Amino acid sequence: MEFTVSNVNLRDLARIFTNLSRIDDAVNWEINKNQIEITCLNSSRSGFSMVTLKKAFFDKYIFQPDSVLLTGLMTPTIRIRTQVKPILSVFRNKIFDFIPTVVTTNSKNGYGSESASRKDVIVENVQISISTGSECRIIFKFLCKHGVIKTYKISYEQTQTLHAVFDKSLSHNNFQINSKILKDLTEHFGQRTEELTIQPLQERVLLTSFTEEVVHNRDILKQPTQTTVSIDGKEFERVALNEGVSVTLSLREFRAAVILAEALGSSICAYYGVPGKPILLTFAKGKNSEIEAQFILATVVGSDEQEVSSMMGNRWQHSSTPASLFNSVERNNSLTAVAHNPPGSIGWQTDQSDSSRMFNSALDRSDETNGIKEPSTTNDAGQSLFLDGIPNESELAAFNNDVNDDAEFGPTQAEQSYHGIFSQED
């Protein structure tokens, strides 16, 4: 079993792992004969993300796994789990070298010469394989010029995967916008800001954050701080929203989705119904959507929004892009194609209490039904078994600098209630 990624796609692969690391310190791999799905679920189980790499994304895709790893009857699938930090370190190492070459071309029309730069990439591709037996490793093998091969082995464990189920038929509010615009706007919010509110108002969309905590027990913020940025309705490629329906979600996961969409050069689509129901963020890259990404995030319900209706307020909509372009993301979105809960799925909703207890208890019931006990990630003292944990913002920024500035991966191609639904795979 072997998957080969060309140097053209290495940058995208690195960015995928970088942004997934903002959500959790581990990722799940779900591999079948047609695609690889990389998923993760945050610690509070209020945010789920999945990136799908289609077969066309790879230069070579050979799916001949050891029968020990296979699960599922209809579609044989491999399900494994790896820590994300070792993967980041693989791509962060200085294993790429570029030799700039200046090419001068004399112009035929007499206007002088034109200079262009070319970069000679030493790493030609990376081969990804999975070993079984006494050494359970996922292997990254970088093939370089002059016959140099760099090999990195990362431990994995077999796992059961959870998939979020999103009912798109209940999403009366949706929009599509250039991800670069959203990324620029989210930079106005501090890194320690936890929540973001999306509110349509008079053919504009307001993004609001509210900070009232003191930083590091110092009296830096003596007064609460509210930051609001406004997006003109004309900035959207497509929009259909009900005024009066605002949703509040985690800024960290929202920012991870926006940064990844901007890095891939894709517009981002959002779908949601009412506060308390999940919001879906989705985008794709490639002519045939070789890369697809979906982020499903829980939203918060305030005390004054318990009776809100999805149809309240004025509704405004417009489109500056052909409907076929907008709908292509929907057709290629395997996650949101589920209209109703499939058999064996579990949906839940809490009262205004402890959200983490709700998510844990719901998934624990699912595991007990299937006879599966989720492995513990803490010791008896309650300390994490993973020493480093999730990368902090400075580590991620350093990695992004390696990817963007050093160009080491080759050229780039153009209180409260929560609601969530997860289905247990066979």
Curated annotation (Swiss-Prot):
GO terms for biological process: cellular response to ionizing radiation; DNA repair; DNA replication checkpoint signaling; mitotic DNA damage checkpoint signaling; mitotic DNA replication checkpoint signaling; mitotic intra-S DNA damage checkpoint signaling; telomere maintenance. Residues 1-147 are annotated as: Required for DNA repair function. It comes from the Eukaryota. Keywords: DNA damage. PANTHER family: CELL CYCLE CHECKPOINT CONTROL PROTEIN, DNA REPAIR PROTEIN RAD9. The keyword DNA damage applies. InterPro entries: DNA_clamp_sf (IPR046938), Rad9 (IPR026584), Rad9/Ddc1 (IPR007268). GO terms for molecular function: protein kinase activator activity; signaling adaptor activity. Acts in DNA repair and mutagenesis. Involved in promoting resistance to ionizing radiation and UV light, as well as regulating cell cycle progression after irradiation. Repressor of entry into mitosis that is activated by chromosome breaks. GO terms for cellular component: checkpoint clamp complex; chromatin; chromosome, telomeric repeat region; cytoplasm; cytosol; nucleus; site of double-strand break. This is DNA repair protein rad9. Disulfide bonds: none annotated. The gene is rad9. Belongs to the rad9 family. It comes from Schizosaccharomyces pombe (strain 972 / ATCC 24843). Pfam families: Rad9. Residues 402-426 are annotated as: Disordered.
